Amino acid sequence: MAHGGDYRQWPFLTTEEFELVCAFFDQKYVKAELGPTRKIFKIRLRRTLTTGSSYIEILRLLHLPEENDDLSLAFEKLNSGLDGPGVDVDMLTAAEDADQEALRPQLQNQHGGAMDSGALPRYSLHSDQPYVTYEVHLHPTYNMPTLWFTLHDLPMGEPTFNLESVYRYLVPPEYKSRLRATGFTGGISAAPHPVTDVPAFFIHPCQTKEAMESFDCTMANYLMIWLGMVGGCVGLWVPPEMAAEEA
């Protein structure tokens, strides 16, 4: 099968190819006419200072606040703190700066070297809203994108690194029995985070190759196709506006 993108070995990605597909995905978000969706769904292209590698970060509220003021507080008053020696670089583009709707929160680093007690992004004291952070990293062994995810600020002090919390807050009902039957191989797995080394959940990439082989897509659409396959089982759907073809 001929593929539009210039891949070295489809559907695997080299480090350079992963950088490109991440950049294309970020630009789709920046240019898409998302309207109010931008207030509850944030995508950022980031780069770690420790390794220089790129990754995609996606921030989503688990529940929409009833009041608009609370929604604004939840996303616009993140405690960014001061960037320290281990912070990652937020790769904002000039195109996004021109987008009046793209009010992306300035998150404190999660992925540097030495981390202080305030390293994880938290909402302001005025608006504690539970949320999930998804990250797309290149797996060093499978050479495929891998979806990592962490829960934050759950109500009543519920544990965030807990498989039952994942099923309660992220996994749609139609996926629960299938994921539980799959187990840790090919389903939801847990391991040290690829950057922080802190335990985190991820979707095991062992079956991604077979799923991607049936598609023919350019690098510009690689992550759109990939997330369409792996994201839904943990509550991640890419806004359809991002799939619109540019004029």
Label for each model-derived stretch:
Residues 1-132, 139-142, 154-246:
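Extended, low-hydrophobicity segments enriched in charged/polar residues
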